[in-house]
From Swiss-Prot:
It is found in: Membrane. Keywords: Membrane, Transmembrane, Transmembrane helix, Transport. This is Protein DETOXIFICATION 55. Belongs to the multi antimicrobial extrusion (MATE) (TC 2.A.66.1) family. The chain crosses the membrane at residues 30-50, 61-81, 112-132, 145-165, 185-205, 207-227, 261-283, 298-318, 344-364, 378-398, 419-439, 447-467. Pfam families: MatE (PF01554). GO terms for molecular function: antiporter activity; xenobiotic transmembrane transporter activity.
Amino acid sequence: MVVEEDSRLINLQHKYNPTMPEVVEELKRIWDISFPVAAMSILNYLKNMTSVVCMGRLGSLELAGGALAIGFTNITGYSVLSGLATGMEPLCGQAIGSKNPSLASLTLKRTIFLLLLASLPISLLWLNLAPLMLMLRQQHDITRVASLYCSFSLPDLLANSFLHPLRIYLRCKGTTWPLMWCTLVSVLLHLPITAFFTFYISLGVPGVAVSSFLTNFISLSLLLCYIYLENNNNDKTTSKSLCLDTPLMLYGSRDSGENDVWSTLVKFAVPSCIAVCLEWWWYEFMTVLAGYLPEPKVALAAAAIVIQTTSLMYTIPTALSAAVSTRVSNELGAGRPEKAKTAATVAVGAAVAVSVFGLVGTTVGREAWGKVFTADKVVLELTAAVIPVIGACELANCPQTISCGILRGSARPGIGAKINFYAFYVVGAPVAVVLAFVWGLGFMGLCYGLLGAQLACAISILTVVYNTDWNKESLKAHDLVGKNVISPNVDQIIVKCEEGLH
């Protein structure tokens, strides 16, 4: 029987239930990948907080202009690069699982090239921030500061175009501890570098932008050194982990299949980018709406605290999502659908546990947490009221974030993009507007809109994951990256059916 007919045989596979030792072993593997990634995310969070604090030390104008620039660069640049880079996860992870390192290396290099191409229009947009903001009637002095920050941040696009793919490549190999150590060293150097450029040589806000680039450049340099040393060590024992000396091969021959990598990479990168941007932009949308509420200063201050809170809480779900994406893609590439299902099940269970801790933590610490950011009593009262709602959002956000990782690992990012659009803009946005402005709930209404979006997203995406046919996904992975392996269980079924036909 041919491969096209394999899908008819999948239902013959017996139901697989993992044993407790298998669950514990999978939990250890997910922990080993996710812990360094979570630590790296927290370190980057501290790096960003350091930059904001330094801008605050410069003055209120610099803080306002810097905040505007950071929001603009996140929306138009960093979210796009991050989203495009995640498109390499299914290709790279499944290629590594199927023992196809040349495809993984080629995917890495082409993703870097794709991000460099995307940086060109982003750079033009950043250079034209001033006329755009003035057209939107933003204050001239704030626009001037924001424009300076964006101009000096242009080199950071180059650094991120290499950093994002390299991090994903190493994570797909399960090599996450070097990522954490490289990030730790660069973040420890970030404070003295920022102090030197911002205050010692009096560059001001441009100094903050330059410092962020230098910190990322240091992290990139350390990662490249690690890869170089690892390749030298592997040269003496096994094959290289990354073929740095192979050409980029932007276009392959007609029969080589190299061009298929380009089309497949773009097919995954675009919906991955859309999925990331749709969720990322919703928080900016909520901030904009807060500015139109009856007490905009209070609402905007509370919105800033909420965004900082969600950013911090998001580190653990993001790490779990990255870990399960790696595990699912590796196991599907290796032709082990039952192991991929186990990884997905264990990760969702861990997500539920983490979300409960998030809800308890925000509820218990809702009053103390606000005091970290402000002493304004009105802002503190509003923050204490909405933080438990944000904690309730985490009950849905954590499982849906992990489920997005499962979809990425099984090469289905398009489904996540569609669900994010439906949940955040068809459900969440209208609910937020009606509750905040029509029913008069104010900023609390916006937070309830976020809760509605997260619930809709979680229910939809968990339904998709629950109904996943893992044997079918394994066959798809074989068609995508594998010429070496196929699911042994399905292969046995095919042989038995062929014998029956004779």
